[in-house]
Amino acid sequence: MLDKLPTEQRNPKTMDIDTKSIKEILEMMNREDFTVPQTVQKEISFIEEAVHRTIHSFKSNGRLIYIGAGTSGRLGVLDASECPPTFGVSSEMVKGLISGGLEAITKAKEGAEDSEAMAKQDLLDIKLTEHDTVIGIAASGRTPYVKGALSYANEIGASTVAISNNKNSEIGKIAEIAIEAETGPEVITGSTRLKAGTAQKLILNMISTASMIGVGKVYENLMVDLKPTNKKLVDRSKRIIMEATQVDYTTAENYLQKANNSVKTAIVMILLNCNVDEAIQHLDRAEGFIRKTK
């Protein structure tokens, strides 16, 4: 039953929050938020498994698919939408699906989460394959939409991961990998957009970032597959080249032009003292990893 879940219980530390000053309310919330990273830390071994599955999908021309309802769905859409500008990947490589469709991102459509069949249809619409990794997200761990998504993904042989905020969750029993960051009672009873949502965001950050590092999208700690699509990003691209190769701004600018605005190619051209075609060949042989071109 929903009312038995830790995330739905009343928090004894905030029973009188409505009598507090604004500063005291903020301090209460901050104290509760401090507990979230520790709950995530306990799940790192399971998060690691999820990253390995995701990297395998990427190397098999598969995708990472986040799916959820409400806040959980929105967080998946958010993380997916940040991957193209950060890592220079196609918007198809990491996708976020939310019950009720894109309209549900800005307007709550709470009833949409109750349909398992809708989740299957949403995955059919994007032509889910066995090469994909599906990550179902639900604070309660029992959302029908997410259960339906994971069940269908299992049927066709995709990798499945469940992220929830309660132990022994229903979605955790369906998925191959269960990440269960038990964040406990919320500051406001049942408002899982708070600690539960924060834990989910941290976990999604870890999965997408570590997976992209695992397929060569990062050199040192630099975003070397960044696409310079506006003035700010053009300037950032030049500075990334400068950091990676220790050249000056003008040299970085020249190489970025020679490399047809590919930061990664420009870096390899400088590091290996080669032309653009040779740099591309080096990167192809190294599967996109700059370190492996040396």
Curated annotation (Swiss-Prot):
Residues 54-217 form the SIS domain. Its EC number is 4.2.1.126. The keyword Translocase does not apply. Keywords: Carbohydrate metabolism, Lyase. It holds the Pfam family GKRP_SIS_N. The keyword Lyase applies. Pathway: Amino-sugar metabolism; N-acetylmuramate degradation. PANTHER family: GLUCOKINASE REGULATORY PROTEIN. A lyase-type mechanism (elimination/hydration) is suggested for the cleavage of the lactyl ether bond of MurNAc 6-phosphate, with the formation of an alpha,beta-unsaturated aldehyde intermediate with (E)-stereochemistry, followed by the syn addition of water to give product. Homodimer. This is N-acetylmuramic acid 6-phosphate etherase. It comes from Oceanobacillus iheyensis (strain DSM 14371 / CIP 107618 / JCM 11309 / KCTC 3954 / HTE831).
